[in-house]
C-alpha cells in the first residue's frame, strides 16, 4: 500500500473511531528510523496510536491475528465476547466476518507478524523489522504480556523485553543507536508522546534488555498516571534515569 492510501485509510479510522488529542507532538522524531512503544488499552490502543502519529508506522501484530484460520479464535475470545459481549454462536459468526476484513487490512497496512512464543520464528519478525528500519521507517510495538493480569489502575500488563532486540540488531547492522519513543494512551481519548530512550550498546545484552524494558514501562505508566489525575502538562515531564 502506498503512503497516500495509508494516510487516507488512517484518516477515515481516526475520524470515526478516535478523534482524540495528541499531547507532546514536539517530542516526535524529525526523521526515521525509530520505534514507538505503547500501552495497548484493549482495541482502542492500536487505533489511537496509528491515527495519532502523523507518520506511517508498521505495527507488530501477534502472528495468529494475521492468520485467516487462527484470527477468528483470537478475536472471538479477546474482543467480540470480552468487549462486545456477544455470546456463541453469534460471537463466532461476528468474529469470522470481522477477520475477513481485518486480516487483509493488517497486511495492507504493512503490519509485521510477531511469533513471540516461537523463538526460532521470531527471527523472521526481526528480519522484517530490520528491513523497515533500515529504510528509515517507523515501527510500533505494544509489548504488554497478554498472559499476565492487568493492573487495576493503569489497565496495563507487565511489558516483555523482546522489543529491545531491535536495538541490538540495529546497532550490530548499522553501528547506530536506535531511539525508542514512549506513548501513553488514556481512555479519555488522549495520547502522550514522551522523549526518546536511546539504546545503549555499551551495556551487556541482558542488562540493556532489562533496562529498556523497565525504563519504558515505568515511563509509560508515569505518563498514563498523570493523565489519569488530569494533569496533561506534567505527563511530559516524567523523570527517567
PLM feature spans:
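Short, charge-rich binding segments
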Residues: 27, 49-51, 103-105, 130-134, ...
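Catalytic core of membrane glycerolipid acyltransferases/transacylases, capturing the structured
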Residues: 30-116
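Conserved beta-strand segments of alpha/beta enzyme cores
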Residues: 19-21, 58, 110, 179
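Hydrophobic alpha-helical segments of integral membrane proteins
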Residues: 5, 9-13, 102-105, 129, ...
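Helix-to-loop junction immediately C-terminal to a conserved catalytic motif
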Residues: 3, 10-42, 51
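A generic local structural motif
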Residues: 8, 19-25, 45-46, 99, ...
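Non-catalytic C-terminal accessory region of glycerolipid acyltransferases
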Residues: 118-241
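Short, solvent-exposed coil/turn elements at secondary-structure transition points
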Residues: 26-28, 63-65, 117, 186, ...
Amino acid at each position: 500500500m502506498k503512503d497516500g492510501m495509508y494516510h487516507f485509510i488512517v484518516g477515515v479510522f481516526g475520524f470515526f473511531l478516535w478523534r482524540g488529542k495528541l499531547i507532546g507532538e514536539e517530542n516526535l522524531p524529525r526523521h526515521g528510523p525509530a520505534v514507538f512503544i505503547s500501552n495497548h488499552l484493549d482495541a482502542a490502543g492500536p487505533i489511537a496510536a496509528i491515527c495519532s502519529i502523523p507518520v506511517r508506522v508498521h505495527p507488530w501484530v501477534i502472528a495468529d491475528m494475521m492468520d485467516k484460520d487462527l484470527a477468528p479464535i483470537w478475536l472471538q475470545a479477546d474482543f467480540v465476547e470480552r468487549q462486545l459481549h456477544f455470546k456463541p454462536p453469534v460471537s463466532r459468526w461476528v468474529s469470522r466476518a470481522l477477520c475477513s476484513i481485518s486480516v487483509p487490512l493488517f497486511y495492507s497496512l504493512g503490519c509485521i507478524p510477531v511469533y513471540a512464543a516461537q523463538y526460532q520464528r521470531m527471527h523472521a519478525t526481526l528480519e522484517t523489522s530490520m528491513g523497515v528500519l533500515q529504510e528509515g521507517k517507523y515501527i510500533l510495538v505494544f509489548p504488554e504480556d497478554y498472559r499476565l493480569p492487568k493492573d487495576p489502575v493503569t489497565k496495563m500488563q507487565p511489558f516483555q523485553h523482546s522489543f529491545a532486540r531491535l536495538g541490538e540488531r540495529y546497532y550490530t547492522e548499522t553501528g547506530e543507536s536506535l531511539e525508542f519513543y514512549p506513548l501513553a494512551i488514556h481512555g479519555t481519548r488522549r495520547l502522550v508522546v514522551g522523549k526518546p530512550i536511546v539504546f545503549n550498546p555499551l551495556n551487556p545484552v541482558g542488562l540493556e534488555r532489562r533496562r529498556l524494558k523497565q525504563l519504558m514501562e515505568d515511563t509509560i505508566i508515569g505518563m498514563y498516571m498523570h493523565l489519569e489525575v488530569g494533569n496533561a502538562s506534567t505527563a511530559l515531564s516524567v523523570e527517567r534515569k
